[in-house]
Amino acid sequence: TSMDAVAAAAGVSKLTVYSHFTDKQTLFCSAVMATCQIQLPDLLFEYPEGAPVDEVLLTIARNFQALISSDEAVKLSRLIMAQGSLDPSFGEYFYEAGPKRVLAGMEALLRGANERGLLRIDNPLRAAEHFFCLVKGAPDYRLLLGCAGPLEGDEAEAHVREVVGVFIRAFHR
């Protein structure tokens, strides 16, 4: 997409777009950050005092599952995979704008859960990576390949509950 097309879609001049975003990469990163912030706000990774750890993890898993299953996220994932071989910086921009921020939030939450004695986690970053990989799992792989639709309703809820159960059993005190 050209900056002309972005300006036309936004109903502003190209100069206005460039005054906010110096190039397409900056615009792309801003869009990814905004989407992640809406679906997985920073507040989601702040551990509410006295909340059961499984409920906190379920809330995060539900939001993440909804994000990765959205039509926009599926299209973006496919685009990044296709463009990555042509321009690796495209994937790097995406990672910095979205997944890295989400991982940092989850890492901090898990570090806090460990310090409170709620879970036993030696490496919170690695545990955060495992958590999100479990949520994605085979259903996301099938979705990206076009072999299946997104998990919805009871099926999505059963999936995230199973993931959280596995995660808690792996890291219980």
What are these regions (language model features)?
Residues 5, 51-56, 123-126:
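A conserved beta-strand->loop->alpha-helix hinge within the catalytic CA
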Residues 23-28, 38, 90, 94:
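Short amphipathic alpha-helical segment with a characteristic S/N-K-E followed by hydrophobic residues
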Residues 24, 31, 35-36, 60, ...:
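Hydrophobic/aromatic residues within well-ordered alpha-helical segments
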Residues 29-60, 68, 72, 111:
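Amphipathic alpha-helical linker/stalk segments
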Residues 55, 66-67, 71, 75, ...:
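Amphipathic alpha-helical packing segments from all-alpha helical-bundle domains
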Residues 59, 63, 100, 104, ...:
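C-terminal peripheral helix-coil segments that are non-catalytic and often amphipathic
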